[in-house]
């Protein structure tokens, strides 16, 4: 009985931490490579990431419900087969929940205390959700640290081992592609979301 409880607890902790690492890799790729003008993925994935660096609080325009549904849909597309093969394990369920919540957790880091739900502020203060101060480090140009948006813990470990710079050096060695090779200029244009139009 005790061993079963310990096993489930370890699975939950690992799922919690791995979900943050997975989202960190995803955000690192979006922030480091490609552009808002890359065919197919530019408009669907990269554009929003670049816009967020220019207008960080634009994320507040989206409801919690919409953010959760959008994240849950794409998460289920790849974690669904794992549920089928391995069952609803505590590890996989925790990963699914935390990745589905990642955009909302990220949104809360851009809100001040009276804007976010009290329960979210409490979870930030007890170290379960990432806080504003922890996420703020990512928004210091050139946006090359603290890519993991969920927990207060994973970024610390990854920055200590300098993971992102090592990965970037490896990618450049293999492909010749430099990280953040071009920062795209923009102009204010009310016809575009958040009033920002990127210049190619």
Swiss-Prot record:
Cellular component GO terms, alphabetical: membrane
Highest taxon, organism lineage: Viruses
Subcellular locations according to the entry: Membrane
Keywords assigned: Membrane, Transmembrane, Transmembrane helix
Chief localization: membrane
Membrane recorded as keyword: yes
Membrane-crossing residue ranges in chain numbering: 9-29, 79-99
Bilayer disposition of the protein: Multi-pass membrane protein
Pfam families in the cross-refs: Lipid_desat
Disulfide links within the chain: none
Family that this chain belongs to: Belongs to the fatty acid desaturase CarF family.
Matches recorded under PANTHER family: LIPID DESATURASE DOMAIN-CONTAINING PROTEIN, PTHR48230
Protein name: Probable fatty acid desaturase MIMI_L630
Lineage: Viruses, Varidnaviria, Bamfordvirae, Nucleocytoviricota, Megaviricetes
């Amino acid at each position: 009985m005790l061993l079963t409880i310990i096993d489930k607890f370890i699975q939950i902790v690992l799922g919690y931490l791995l979900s943050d690492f997975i989202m960190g890799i995803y955000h690192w790729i979006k922030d480091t490579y490609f552009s808002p003008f890359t065919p197919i993925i530019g408009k669907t994935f990269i554009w929003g990431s670049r816009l967020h660096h220019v207008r960080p609080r634009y994320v507040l325009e989206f409801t919690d419900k919409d953010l959760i549904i959008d994240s849950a849909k794409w998460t289920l597309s790849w974690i669904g087969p794992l549920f089928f093969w391995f069952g609803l394990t505590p590890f996989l369920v925790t990963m699914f929940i935390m990745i589905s919540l990642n955009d909302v957790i990220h949104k809360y880091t851009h809100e001040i205390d009276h804007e976010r739900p009290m329960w979210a502020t409490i979870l930030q203060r007890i170290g379960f959700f990432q806080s504003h101060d922890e996420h703020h480090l990512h928004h210091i140009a050139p946006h090359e640290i603290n890519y993991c948006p969920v927990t207060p813990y994973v970024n610390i470990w990854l920055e200590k081992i300098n993971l992102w710079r090592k990965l970037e050096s490896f990618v450049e060695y293999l492909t010749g592609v430099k990280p953040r090779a071009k920062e795209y200029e923009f102009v204010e244009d009310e016809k575009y979301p958040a009033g920002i139009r990127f210049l190619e």
